[in-house]
Amino acid sequence: MTLASESLPLSGLKVLSVEFYGAGPFCTQYLSTFGADVIKIENSTQGGDFARTTGPNSLGPEDSLYFQSFNQGKRSLSLDLKDKKGKEVLHRLVAKSDVITNNLRGDKPEQLGLTYSVLKEVNPKIVCTHLS
């Protein structure tokens, strides 16, 4: 973290985001801009966020300007959240995070264990948000 980023309002906030295309990346782009440390969790079984291949692709076939615009300043990790090992990695990250957010459709957060009722067992202080 640089001296400049330490003075931003969300400096020190650790955010996990299970997100793809649209509202999720747009939301966490702002969190990152204001100093939050954002880790984008992408689905390893589907090749990550499909926005990677959304045009224009002037940077390369899987390096979309759209994707780069909404994901600048974030780190990313590819996990299978249906797999036991993927869940273990997610839980280790949740234990060290302040916020987890997602923009998955209605029943997916519950299916993947991304609700407060599940994650409070790992980190009772975690803030869970769901974008729709």
Q: What kind of feature is each model-predicted range?
A:
Residues 1-132:
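N-terminal helix-loop segment corresponding to the beta1-alpha1 unit
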